[in-house]
């Protein structure tokens, strides 16, 4: 039996297994059986017989297992009945798959003589069941889709329905996450089938949803075939265009900006192929809508740049047929109106589009009308440059530069000159806006890209040279960027635009962003890396002579533009130059070492013969020119600093560089005695190990020892830095400790001196200088780190020595002739402050070891309570000097404690003790000078306490908060009492406490939810102070003419003015303050005509706005209700003060509550 006959018999209903075996053989690439070849061999009658059998096989399989049972195939079940049913369904799926493959293969053998009605029916059945197939049978869905595609492509009977089925399947597949590019290509291949769908029919609803999803699919938007397909969808129906545009607009914010060009391309393709109503709809409903939004969207809207991107794409297509005319027609009702709009942002947006689309013209206009249209648009450009809004003027500058750069040859010279004169003459010096000035220099590089503009700009730009000194940094940055552009395009010599002395003057003083750009501008001029090293040195000297400070700045950033190798070469070349200068001065002394001809370190420097330079430098430099010598040494320091990391990574090069400079450093110290030369030499020495410069390293400590007290910081700073870099900071501390110990009271000095062997030195001790050294070390981070890295024993010894100053301070508080010392008051106070500061640095360093050093500060607080405060509290008359000393000690201690609180080192125990000291200080009533610092401390403790309570509700802070409230209350009482007794001093005190008091109130207000008790207590204290003071001032009025209600806070008495100034800064504080005032009035805690009037004055000054806030009205209403109870006062004599106050208050209340 032949294969043909066997296959035909297998398609019978009783031979399903044989049929499936044939299908399996067909799918097996390695088997020679090919269904396509077999079908080619069949006669017309056999083909028809085969298709009949396939139809019968398919229908009987579907009848045996109808669609309703198919979903069970995906369900896992152990039920025997369901397992058997699932097995039957799987068999049916195999039959469907086999029939589909056979039907698809049959399409190749259909010709005009064959009747394929049966095959059509079979394909129709398959097409009908495709959507009911289980998800697990995706391979059958794919086979049916291929069948439908092939049917449609062959153009057989019923192709429209099969095409629609294939289209829907491909459309859904293309929207899947795992979609492949080929699916989108196939979808485009079937795009004509969309026209078979009736847009208004029910079946098209699902199609519409899927099609609209395509416009949100990145795969469709990015692929060429996808964009073709999407642009084709515009032609389906006019109403669908609006749906497409609405979908894109709604999702525009979610789409990345990078896709906007593709989105615009879709619109453009659709527009290009459209005609009639479709064209009109695309233009008016889509493109013109984008134009409208491009003009009216706020500039800060995330959609604005995306809409601009879409419109820019259309502007770029102006040379394409019909685009220019389309833009002219669509912009006509939008852009000209936008340019005249009242809203400056709308004008600016319209200007941006106008500039991009320029010229907006209809190519169909005649020559005369075209000229008029262009002239009108140039007039609009001039109008933009004269707009009152800086944003619009900036846009106008951008527009002029873009347009003139693009159309330079076509614009009349007179207009070009006028435009540039307007920009460079007026707007570059626009005093009202730095943004406009900045835009001028940012946009000029656009114009410089056109070489034709260079001659005119070369003549006009020198007038702008002083713009380099603009007070706005961004303008200066833009100006230098413009000079860089001029240099890059070779439009002119940049130093002719802006003279070199101006550029260097700016480099000397300007910020990093400007300086780095200037260095970039000047780099090739002063560091020509393509020339010999001697030339580099010559340029360096020339730069020094032009501007030494600018030279240092230049070489500070030079490393950014060249390799470390070149920097090192320049350092060594300068070294040779300095050596040559010294040799000419002292010809008999050879400052050169024998190693100068040796090889260099790997990759950094190369050896050069150390012979005297025979160059122009000999005629310029001399050791007598100390300024130039110092500048060269400073530049070596700057250069070395810039490549320290590179040298650290190349040990051989580092060693070579150190050896070169170490060999000549002693001669440099001999030759260059001036202080300005000595400083860089010391810094150079600090870059080397001390063993490399033994003579100098042994003399550093001696230099520090022999300095006079009161020496300037610059005399010892570099020496101390040097020792710190060498790890010898301990020597400085030993010297400082020695001087301090010798200056303290004699009994202590003798006791300490017995414990150590010391070289006899007849020099007197210098405690002030010792403190200068210690303070310098502690103030600078690098030095402080070196200090704290010492052994704990040495640090404790320093702390102990500094702590002995308390005995000196006690001597000033309670003078005694029995004790002598050599420390003045200022020095003692500095030592005390450094003692407290050092204890905190040590606590931070060794925090993991407990609170040892924090307890030191607590002990100091105990000393203040036991020794300092009793002196202030005593009723004995003490002189002004001890009292001032007590105040200064308190200030120094509280300042350090405030810093401890701020950096988070204070635990609850420390806070409690500090709060106790604060209360003690306030209760003395003689420490008003300390009140500003006390308020700062209260603020910090309050913030820590409330934050802790807020984060952990179980924390008990009530005692602490009560103490804070008590301290605050006492502080305000002290201020009020001071105002009554010594008003002039108190007024100065109010100025100093306003800032810390405001910070305290702000903290309490911000954390009011953490402690309502503290919040209310603070507000009631402030309120009582204000009401009492204003009432007191009203009570002192003797003449009715003096009764003037306050119109602002400045009209209030001093304390009230201070408090209300703080309150009105925060709307929430005003609201809380007035609520507290209203409650006090309601509870009759504020009563009487004068007190209620004082409360009214508070309400009046609390509102800055014309519209009276609800909180102010509530307070006014409460005052009105209580004040009415005193109406009998109107029966008093007309000259009565209380009556006048009452009537004045009622008038104010009537105006507030019943405005006309």
From Swiss-Prot:
InterPro entries: ARM-like, ARM-type_fold, Condensin2_G2
Disulphide-bridged cysteine pairs: none
Skewed-composition ranges (Acidic residues): 589-601
Predominant location: nucleus
Residue span of region Disordered: 587-611
Role played: Regulatory subunit of the condensin-2 complex, a complex which establishes mitotic chromosome architecture and is involved in physical rigidity of the chromatid axis.
Full protein name: Condensin-2 complex subunit G2
UniProt organism field: Xenopus laevis
């Amino acid at each position: 039996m032949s294969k043909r006959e066997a296959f035909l018999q297998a398609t019978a209903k009783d031979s399903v297994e044989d049929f499936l075996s044939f299908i399996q053989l067909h799918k097996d690439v390695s088997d020679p059986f090919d269904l396509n070849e077999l079908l080619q061999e069949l006669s017309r009658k056999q083909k028809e017989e085969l298709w009949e059998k396939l139809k019968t096989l398919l229908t009987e399989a579907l009848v045996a297992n109808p669609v309703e049972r198919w979903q069970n195939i995906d369900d896992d079940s152990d039920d025997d009945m369901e397992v058997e049913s699932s097995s039957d369904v799987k068999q049916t799926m195999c039959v469907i798959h086999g029939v589909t493959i056979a039907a698809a293969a049959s399409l190749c053998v259909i010709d005009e003589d064959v009747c394929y009605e049966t095959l059509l029916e079979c394909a129709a059945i398959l097409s009908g069941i495709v959507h009911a197939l289980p998800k697990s049978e995706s391979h059958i869905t794919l086979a049916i889709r291929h069948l439908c595609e092939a049917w449609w492509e062959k153009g057989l009977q019923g192709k429209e329905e099969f095409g629609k089925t294939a289209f829907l399947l491909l459309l859904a597949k293309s929207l899947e996450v795992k979609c492949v590019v080929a699916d989108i290509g196939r979808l485009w291949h079937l795009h004509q089938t969309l026209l078979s769908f009736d847009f208004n029919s029910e079946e098209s609803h699902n199609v519409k949803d899927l099609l609209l999803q395509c416009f949100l699919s990145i795969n469709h938007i990015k692929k060429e075939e996808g964009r073709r397909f999407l642009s084709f969808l515009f032609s389906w129906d006019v109403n669908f265009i609006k749906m497409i545009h609405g979908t894109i607009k709604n999702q525009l914010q979610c789409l990345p900006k990078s896709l906007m060009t593709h989105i615009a391309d879709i619109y453009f393709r659709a527009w290009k192929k459209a005609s009639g109503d479709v064209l009109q709809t695309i233009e008016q409903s889509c493109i013109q809508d984008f134009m409208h939004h491009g003009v009216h969207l706020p500039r800060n809207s995330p959609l604005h740049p995306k809409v601009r991107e879409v419109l820019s794409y259309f502007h770029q297509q102006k040379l394409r047929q019909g685009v220019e005319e389309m833009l002219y027609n669509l912009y006509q009702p939008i852009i000209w109106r936008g340019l005249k709009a009242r809203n400056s942002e709308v004008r600016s947006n319209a200007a941006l589009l106008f500039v991009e689309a320029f010229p907006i013209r209809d190519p169909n206009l005649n020559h005369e009308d075209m000229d008029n249209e262009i002239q009108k648009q140039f007039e609009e450009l001039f109008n933009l440059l004269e707009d009152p809004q800086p944003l619009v003027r900036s846009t106008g500058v951008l527009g002029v530069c873009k347009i003139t750069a693009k159309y330079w040859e076509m614009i009349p010279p007179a207009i070009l000159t006028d435009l540039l004169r307007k920009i460079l003459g007026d707007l570059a010096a626009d005093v009202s806006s730095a943004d406009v000035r900045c835009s001028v220099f940012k946009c000029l590089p656009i114009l410089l890209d056109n070489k034709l503009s260079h001659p005119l700009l070369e003549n006009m730009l020198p007038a702008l040279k002083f713009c380099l000194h603009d007070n706005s940094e961004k303008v200066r940055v833009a100006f230098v960027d413009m000079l860089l552009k001029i240099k890059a395009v070779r439009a002119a010599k940049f130093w002719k635009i802006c003279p070199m002395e101006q550029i260097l003057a700016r480099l000397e003083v300007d910020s990093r962003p400007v300086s780095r750009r200037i260095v970039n501008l000047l780099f090739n001029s002063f560091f020509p890396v393509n020339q010999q090293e001697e030339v580099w040195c010559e340029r360096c000297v020339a730069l020094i002579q032009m501007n030494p400070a600018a030279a240092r700045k230049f070489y500070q950033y030079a490393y950014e533009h060249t390799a470390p190798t070149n920097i090192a070469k320049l350092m060594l070349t300068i070294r040779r130059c300095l050596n040559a200068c010294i040799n000419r001065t002292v010809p008999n002394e050879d400052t050169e070492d024998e190693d100068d001809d040796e090889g260099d370190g790997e990759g950094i420097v190369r050896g050069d013969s150390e012979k005297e330079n025979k160059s122009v430098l000999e005629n310029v430099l001399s050791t007598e020119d100390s300024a130039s010598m110092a500048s060269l040494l400073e530049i070596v320091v700057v250069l070395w600093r810039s490549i320290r990391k590179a040298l650290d990574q190349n040990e051989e090069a580092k060693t070579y560089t150190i050896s070169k400079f170490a060999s000549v450093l002693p001669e440099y110290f001999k030759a260059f005695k001036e202080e300005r030369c000595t400083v860089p030499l010391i810094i150079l020495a600090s870059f080397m190990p001390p063993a490399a410069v033994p003579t100098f390293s042994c003399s550093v400590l001696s230099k520090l020892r022999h300095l006079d007290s009161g020496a300037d910081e610059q005399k010892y700073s570099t020496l101390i830095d040097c020792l710190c870099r060498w790890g010898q900071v301990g020597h400085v501390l030993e010297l400082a400790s020695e001087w301090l110990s010798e200056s303290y009271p004699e009994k202590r000095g003798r006791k300490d001196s017995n414990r150590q062997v010391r070289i006899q030195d007849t020099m007197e001790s210098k405690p002030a200088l010792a403190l200068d050294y210690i303070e310098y070390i502690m103030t600078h981070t690098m030095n402080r780190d070196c200090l704290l890295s010492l052994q704990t024993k040495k640090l404790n010894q320093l702390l102990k020595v500094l702590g002995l100053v308390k005995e000196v301070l006690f001597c000033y508080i309670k003078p005694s002739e029995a004790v002598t010392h050599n420390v003045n008051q200022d020095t003692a106070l500095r030592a005390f402050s450094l003692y407290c500061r050092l204890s905190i640095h040590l606590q931070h360093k060794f925090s993991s070891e407990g609170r040892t050093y924090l307890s030191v500060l607590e002990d100091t607080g105990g000393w203040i309570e036991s020794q300092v405060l009793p002196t202030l509290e005593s009723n004995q008359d003490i002189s002004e000097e001890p009292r001032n000393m007590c105040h200064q000690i308190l200030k120094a201690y509280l300042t350090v404690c405030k810093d401890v609180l701020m950096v988070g080192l204070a635990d609850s125990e420390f806070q409690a003790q500090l709060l106790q000291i604060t209360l003690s200080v306030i209760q003395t009533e003689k420490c008003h000078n300390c009140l500003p610092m006390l308020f700062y401390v209260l603020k910090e403790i309050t913030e820590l306490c409330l934050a802790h309570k807020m984060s952990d509700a179980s924390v008990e802070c009530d005692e602490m908060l009560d103490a804070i409230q008590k301290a605050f209350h006492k502080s305000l009482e002290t201020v009020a009492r001071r105002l009554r007794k010594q008003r002039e001093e108190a007024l100065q005190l109010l100025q100093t406490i306003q800032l810390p008091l405001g910070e305290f109130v702000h903290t309490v207000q911000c954390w009011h939810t953490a402690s309502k008790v503290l919040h209310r207590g603070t507000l009631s204290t402030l309120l009582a102070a204000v009401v009492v003071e204003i009432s007191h001032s009203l009570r002192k009025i003797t003449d009715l003419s003096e009764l003037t209600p306050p119109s602002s806070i400045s009209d209030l008495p001093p304390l009230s003015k201070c408090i209300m100034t703080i309150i009105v800064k925060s709307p929430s504080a005003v609201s809380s303050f007035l609520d507290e005032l209203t409650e006090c009035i309601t509870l009759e805690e504020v009563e009487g005509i004068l007190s209620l009037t004082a409360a009214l004055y508070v309400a009046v000054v609390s509102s800055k706005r014309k519209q009276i806030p609800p909180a102010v009205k509530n307070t006014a209403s409460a005052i009105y209700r209580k004040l009415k109870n005193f109406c009998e006062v109107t029966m008093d004599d007309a000259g009565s003060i209380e009556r006048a106050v009452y009537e004045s208050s009622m008038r104010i209340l009537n105006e507030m509550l019943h405005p006309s």
